[in-house]
Amino acid sequence: MYTCGIDVGSVSTEAVILFRDNENPDVKGRIVSYVIIPTGASSKDAALKSFEEACLKASVSKEDVSSIVATGYGRINIPFANKNITEISCHARGVLHYFTAVKTVIDIGGQERKARADHMALWPMLWTLGFI
């Protein structure tokens, strides 16, 4: 199963395609491609371009991607996303999934900088949002 995450920021837009084997659900999603492009004047256009380029790079058709999650400054401008989630929620979920020993996350974006220390403090928020 392929999924895509798209982060639309004020400066750059990133897309990543992940593959997860449904036959082996204990294996974490594997990155099969990613792209980073300038956002430019249209976050919607940048999101679509990054998605198409990531699919091309992974040799995956857009139809093979079962879910698209958008985050970042321009996340609400991505009509083809199945879900949009705030950056802090994405950071927390990603860190807890892939890097359980990490205690600090720093996000340096084009408009703002965010830091979150001690990821255990994120558990109540994740519980409330239904992520755990």
Feature map (PLM): residue ranges:
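Short glycine-rich, Thr/Ser-proximal phosphate-binding strand/loop in the N-terminal lobe
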Residues: 5-45, 53, 121-129
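Structured core elements
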Residues: 5-7, 14-17, 69, 77, ...
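Short beta-strand-loop/turn "lid" adjacent to the catalytic site in phosphate-handling enzymes
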Residues: 33-40, 57-89, 123
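Conserved glycine-centered beta->alpha loop in an early N-terminal alpha/beta scaffold
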Residues: 48
